[in-house]
């Protein structure tokens, strides 16, 4: 069926989705608890929305649509508190983090939902390996053309979000040497990567999408695992590169960083996006995944080599007036702190060095989720 029209949204509104880990408190491994959690959540009023994810040791939550940082953070606190309460009743821990440090993918169970079963039949073992945990950020757009402009203008900032959110250094009991190992699992899927360079919504909808649908490869936008994708049914663009942070404060701060960036980009303060910008896209993405804030980027316009951490700090200075207008200065202060104190990946490595067991690392992640102010 044709791609639905792009819904008009209030510009720069935002929403957050978080994929969270469900932890057995007896051994700190993942546990297939989402059916029980979902049933219990469904019996009471929940301050947001919740859905199953591809395997039963995962849970996705989503906020409402918000305009400002304080509103978003307040709801995330309420959601966190509700999840912790339900988890305590079931003796299940809940935490962030882009990967679980030592779970084995072969132990995971596919959630009994038609779409998930179809995906599992198509992609085989990759589906269980997709037991990874990300944050998705939605930003409201007025029309499809604006959405595509922002989507491609943001491409040079994707490494910022990867490095700032990085929380997946460990996979199957090994330190991967990556700060965000999670994204390597996403890249295994054939429809991952980046969106085609199209700036006109009709051309995207009637040209690209209709052709892809005609091939039989895709049925909806859900079939694309792009780093950034338009969501016409919501009237948003959706960023999908972030690891799930260990705290809801960081989740809110990342959303507001994207909101302020979009506000800045809409004033045409930078050269227009171009297909050639993507010549360095995968390299820059790799640098952020592998080295985090210590990565080195190639600027897509000038080909100058720049330090990722310094590029974030320069961007924060540019965004200060936009954050003031959006009442999100506290959020950008949190981003600034990450550049100086380190990412969640650094925190997890520090805890492993301190305790020398990955079970202790998971326990520290559980504490971080509950400890949010």
From Swiss-Prot:
A Pfam family it matches: GCS2
The keyword Iron-sulfur appears for this protein: no
UniProt entry keywords in alphabetical sequence: ATP-binding, Ligase, Nucleotide-binding
Listed GO MF terms: ATP binding; glutamate-cysteine ligase activity
SUPFAM superfamilies in the cross-refs: Glutamine synthetase/guanido kinase
A biological process term (GO) from this entry: modified amino acid biosynthetic process
NCBIfam families, A to Z: gshA_cyan_rel, PRK13516.1
Its job: ATP-dependent carboxylate-amine ligase which exhibits weak glutamate--cysteine ligase activity.
Homology family: Belongs to the glutamate--cysteine ligase type 2 family. YbdK subfamily.
Name of the featured protein: Putative glutamate--cysteine ligase 2-2
Origin species: Legionella pneumophila (strain Corby)
